[in-house]
Every structure is written in C-alpha cells, then in structure tokens.
Regions:
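ABC family nucleotide-binding domain
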Residues: 1-174
Length: 174
C-alpha cells in the first residue's frame, strides 16, 4: 500500500534522513522508534508532503511520486487519503471539540454541516469524548486534546493515519 524508497532530507549541512526505505502493507501498524532529533517526525512530514524531501520515491495505492518533485495538486490529493495527528495536536483554540473535528470536513471536504456533525459525534464517541463535544481545548486535559485530534483524523476515514508521538499525552484508559 505505501512504500518509501531512498528518501533523503537535509537541513543545511545536517543530513536527517539518509536514504530511508519503508514498506507498510494495508492493516499494518508500524512504529518508528529513535532518540530525539533522529528524524522520526521529519520522515512522517515528508511522507505526508508537509515537508519537502530532497529525494527519494513514494509509492501509494499504485501511484509513484518522486519526492522533491511532487506538485501541490498531487500532494493535496494524496493528503485527502491520509490523516496526521500532530505531536502538539494543532487544535483550534477558539473552537469546541466537535467544531475541531468537523472543521476539515465542512471546509476542506465541502461536506454538508449536518453530515459533518453526525460524523464528528461518532468520531468523538469512538475516542470516549462524546460528553465533551462542547468543550474548548483549554477545558480539556492533554490526553483529551490528543483524543480530539485522533477523532479529527478518523472522521476523514483515511487510508493511513500518521501519528507523531502518539503516546505522549494519552490517558491510560483509552
């Protein structure tokens, strides 16, 4: 389903990704482990086109992309098949949990608001936050904020979800 070959990325003289290869089959759960600063986040960001790789190739669902030469249109199209749960969650501080989940569906995917709300509520229920849909991020614990970010990701029904530091704030009961 997803294959990355020879991916390279440098920041100035610092080579962070040195011809990394990775293959992930449908249904696989893959963890990338390493010390701080070893390129884990950079790899995920390059695979989701949030960072431009210096080289390499990405194959996804039978499509081949030369990293470093992917058009904005192709990157956006591919991103619609994926979701990214950021280390700092990237929630909108002025929006409720439900609004954080539905915003991308309504604005990005042009989904009718009523349908987005229904999907958003289902996603919040899956992560155990249906009773917190009207809470703002400042009213939620770190683990609850991360679960809102996870709900936002699963609401889009992606083929792949990238998690950056997925266990950093999760509550033990999830």
């Amino acid at each position: 389903m997803l294959e990355v070959t020879q991916i390279r990325k440098s920041f100035g003289d610092l080579e962070v990704l040195k011809q990394v290869d990775l293959q992930v089959n449908k249904g696989d759960v893959v963890a990338i482990l390493g010390p701080s600063g070893s390129g884990k986040t950079t790899l995920l960001r390059c695979m989701n086109f949030l960072e431009t790789a210096d080289g390499g190739e990405l194959n996804f669902d039978g499509e081949r992309f030369l990293l470093g030469h992917v058009s904005k249109k192709d990157a956006a199209r591919l991103r619609k098949k994926t979701a990214f749960v950021f280390q700092n969650y990237n929630l909108f501080r002025n929006k409720t949990a439900l609004e954080n989940v539905t915003e991308g569906l309504i604005i990005g995917r042009k989904m009718p608001k009523a349908e987005a709300i229904q999907i958003g509520r289902q996603a919040l229920e899956k992560v155990g936050l249906s009773d917190r849909e009207d809470y703002y991020p400042s009213q939620l614990s770190g683990g609850q904020q991360q679960r809102v970010a996870i709900a936002r990701a699963i609401a889009t029904k992606p083929e792949i979800i990238y998690f950056d530091e997925p266990t950093s704030a999760l509550d033990p009961e999830l």
